[in-house]
A protein has these predicted regions:
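An acidic, glycine-rich "communication" segment
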Residues: 11-99, 104
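A glycine-centered loop/beta-turn motif at secondary-structure junctions
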Residues: 1-17, 30, 34-35, 83-148
Length: 148
């Protein structure tokens, strides 16, 4: 139902976390589902968590994408994310340790986007949440998938 809705013009954002994508002990089980079908990424079939307690610095891959409009070019460190693989034809907007952090795609008449870290406060620590670019980034992701 969700996949058909997105293809028909709906919007989907999937954020990371312990029970997102494949998640802790692969218990989230999004690999091979209709949800994965409309994502810009493919999920692994095993525990996909990448814990980076030392901090991992996100890299901008598509600075001109609307999701990054008004967002500072340098992001604070993240403490983890879910590892996924970019699908052919999807846009890699930002990455962390070479893995997709923000990716987006058009799906039929709709759009989907992933943010593979969580939204806080676990992998997305307080300095990231308080960073001046956090609110615009989150707002831009919503605006982009909504087609505005």
């Amino acid at each position: 139902l969700l996949a058909e809705w997105v293809k028909g013009g709906g919007a989907l954002i999937m954020a990371g976390g312990y029970l997102s994508f494949q998640g802790f002990e692969a218990k989230a089980r999004f690999a091979g589902t209709a949800v994965e079908e409309v994502l810009p990424v493919t999920c692994f079939t095993h525990d996909d968590r990448a814990e980076t307690p030392e901090g991992a610095v996100p890299q901008i891959n598509d600075a001109k994408h609307a999701v990054l409009a008004g967002v500072p070019a340098t992001m604070p460190v993240l403490l983890g994310y879910n590892r996924v693989q970019l699908k052919p034809g999807a846009t890699l907007i930002a990455s962390v340790n070479g893995d997709p952090l923000i990716a987006a795609t058009q799906v039929g008449k709709g759009r989907s986007l992933v943010w593979t870290s969580d939204i806080g406060p676990h992998w997305c620590p307080e300095p990231f949440v308080k960073w001046e670019g956090f609110a615009p980034l989150m707002a831009n992701m919503i605006t982009w998938v909504a087609g505005k």
